[in-house]
Amino acid sequence: TGTPVKILVVRNILLLLFCLVVLLVFAQSSFLPPCEPVNETVAVEKEGCPKCLVFQTTICSGHCLTKEPVYKSPFSTVYQHVCTYRDVRYETVRLPDCPPGVDPHITYPVALSCDCSLCTMDTSDCTIESLQPDFCMSQREDFPVY
């Protein structure tokens, strides 16, 4: 009579552990901000222009669910999804005090919608640690917000 009771106890413990893992996965994803457009202060600068321009725009930010396999096979590839642009519109700003001969205009993407997908280096910063979006190498010029 002792063996069926032990099997029942082990089964209940395994079921409880499974439920806890599922609960933790859902709890973690509900506390992390989703991938969505957010307002952010960014800086743009251009070689030849003495000042960088700091202004507000909309970027994609948030968390995407990822999977990291325990066993990494040399024959399989792991693709990690990141929060990146889905739909964008482009706007142009003029940098102040650029000397003659230097085009003072910079065009940048404005996020309309975001998506968890593979990182596209053409439109996204996919580095592990990057500079803050409002970092400037040159003198700052804050753009008035209307």
From Swiss-Prot:
Question: What GO biological process terms does the UniProt entry carry, in alphabetical order?
Answer: G protein-coupled receptor signaling pathway; positive regulation of androgen secretion; positive regulation of estradiol secretion; positive regulation of gene expression
Q: Name one GO cellular component term.
A: cytoplasm
- Which cellular compartments is it found in? Secreted
> Which GO molecular function annotations are given, in alphabetical order?
follicle-stimulating hormone receptor binding; hormone activity; lutropin-choriogonadotropic hormone receptor binding; protein heterodimerization activity
As given in the record, the signal peptide range reads 1-28
For this chain, the annotated S-S bridges are C35-C83, C49-C98, C52-C136, C60-C114, C64-C116, C119-C126
Q: Gene3D superfamilies per the record?
A: Cystine-knot cytokines
InterPro entries xref list:
Cystine-knot_cytokine (IPR029034), Glyco_hormone_CN (IPR006208), Gonadotropin_bsu (IPR001545), Gonadotropin_bsu_CS (IPR018245)
Q: Which stretches are transmembrane?
A: none
Ordered alphabetically, the record's keywords are: Disulfide bond, Glycoprotein, Hormone, Secreted, Signal
Which residues does the record list as glycosylated?
A: N39
User: Does the keyword section mention Secreted?
Assistant: yes
Q: How does it assemble?
A: Heterodimer of an alpha and a beta chain.
Q: Which family does it belong to?
A: Belongs to the glycoprotein hormones subunit beta family.
Protein's job: Involved in gametogenesis and steroidogenesis.
PANTHER family cross-referenced by the UniProt entry: GLYCOPROTEIN HORMONE BETA CHAIN, LUTROPIN SUBUNIT BETA
The name this protein carries in UniProt is Gonadotropin subunit beta-2
Source organism per entry reads: Ctenopharyngodon idella
Species lineage, top-down? Answer: Eukaryota, Metazoa, Chordata, Craniata, Vertebrata
Question: Gene that codes for this?
Answer: cgbb
